[in-house]
């Protein structure tokens, strides 16, 4: 017999249960109904393993002040970092472009709304509160975003991004950003244009 516990584990994050924390608690409950020697325990930790391995780098491409609100438009999207639309917060760090005109006069801002490139209301990625003023050319680097971001990344408005791997402290490009050519590959229409 077997018991499949599925996924949804938090392993790999500080302050959260780690994989070894789950199994003694699970085993204690299962022993009431199953014989350990005759029962296979299956776990599917996928996203919690893959997320730790990936980051997603976005750049601020536009800044808009509307009334008392500041909106930052990025070249990434919530669809890239949270395709299941369930996260309420994101782990990230900033890489500020100090070559920006006015960068030396950055101030702390009470509120900045970080948005993706799409026109959809759900593409508001997060509210950046009481933080340094972000400007065009700054980067927002999202951490722990590997689970499902590659397989569920839509081709909505933008194509798949460049993908890099870090090996021995160096970055290597392993996939080029898609262009219309890759999007149209295997299309009958595209094939006719090539004749």
Q: Language-model segments: what does each one mean?
A:
Residues 13-14, 144:
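Conserved "cap/hinge" positions at secondary-structure junctions
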Residues 21-29:
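Alpha-helical scaffolding segments of alpha/beta enzyme cores, especially the outer helices
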Residues 3-13, 43-48:
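Glycine-rich beta-strand-to-loop/alpha-helix junction loops that act as flexible
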Residues 25, 40-195:
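Charged (often Lys/Glu-rich) extended helix/loop segments that serve as interaction or gating elements
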Residues 1-5, 39, 166:
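Short intrinsically disordered, low-complexity coil segments enriched in acidic
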Residues 1-2, 31-32, 133-135:
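Short hydrophobic/aromatic-rich motifs at helix boundaries and adjacent loops
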Residues 31-38, 66:
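Short helix-capping segments at alpha-helix termini
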Residues 14-22:
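Alpha-helix N-cap and loop-to-helix initiation/capping positions
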